[in-house]
Amino acid sequence: DIILKVRAPEKSEFSKIKLGQHIISFIWPGQNKALLDSLKKKKVTVQAMDMIPRISRAQKMDALSSMANIAGYRAVIEAGNQFGRFFTGQITAAGKVPPAKVLVIGAGVAGLAAIGTAQSMGAIVRAFDVRPEVAEQIESMGAEFLMLDFDSDGTGEGGYAKPASKEFIKKEMELFRAQAPEIDIVITTALIPGMPAPKLWPAEMVGLMKPGSVIVDLAAEQGGNCDVTIPDKMIETKNKVKVIGYTDLPSRMATQSSNLYSTNTRHMIDDLTPEKNGVPYVNMEDDVIRGATVLHNGEITFPPPKPKIVAIAKHTNEKVKEKTPEEISKEKIEAEKKSGRLQAVLLIIGACLTWYIGMYAPAEFMQHFIVFILSCFVGYQVIWNVAHSLHTPLMAVTNAISSIIIL
């Protein structure tokens, strides 16, 4: 009654599909309209694992993220296999080996996995994404976020990117053109739902790369981000750049992929059978089920309604107005005046407190008390005048000086 698959049904399998059957698999309905029309004739209900919305409640069944995570990791492994040098820099008796420079285009799940893997292997990692809110994620993983000086936000719906304007693409190409000659490994991961993969690394960029460089195109199955990518093949260009267009990267880690995908599909079945009676119920009011359902009893329900939640962009490329020397000088004078007033108030309070204690305390106590106050003041001045950069490596010395003065 229910068929669980990885890839969409093939033509040779159509004859085996029964009327009214339930199919759960990757479908890619945006690129496979003919497939939807063929399945419609069978009056089947189809949940596309690639159409599950990117919301928190659906993470447990988000097969795209699971497979993208594996693909991003494996992309770095495949690149390292074809790359002729170390990822990390080394200084040996035979000479100095520079670290590999890796550029990751697209900082989704696959991109972040690739960044983390390359960074852990010692490479210098740079990353680019049209969505400004991912800059913090990239930098938190130790990579450099390549910022475009362009007032535009590429954030789309459901956590994906949206198509960019011609002006933005022009600026983007200028950035990549500057990066291409010095980058050793390029990993492209950019996809737009329901559309062919955007062309982000044209043949011109490939020609600018050094001999021995490697390009891994994770969007090869959807047309590729690189002009010269051939799906399912690895080619070498005239200038000795290797371009990897494998579309089965998750299958190259079959055990891990099977475990994650089976968990995703199990959670999908759990949501389809809320009564736990084994009978699937397609609740079209449920955002997750509605988003994944592309055929319902033979009726095409693709595309789903737009997601209600859109990521809030963080504009990190806003220019900060620089202060003039006059403004800086004025602020400094104001700060000194404020500090002076505060010190005067504290001295008056301290003097009053000392006088009050002296009225009732024994003479011996007052002698010790005054010495203690003076030692605190001297200690404060000594420690405060130590350069800030020395405090951390010399923390033991700093503490020792403080203790000696107090004693």
Kindly label every feature range from the protein language model.
Residues 2-77:
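Phosphate/diphosphate ligand-binding glycine-rich loop within oxidoreductases
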Residues 88-179, 332-336:
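Glycine-rich phosphate/diphosphate-binding loop of Rossmann-like nucleotide-binding domains
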Residues 173, 326-353:
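Membrane-water interface at loop-to-transmembrane-helix junctions
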Residues 369-371, 392-403:
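Cytoplasmic-side transmembrane-helix entry/capping segments in multi-pass membrane proteins
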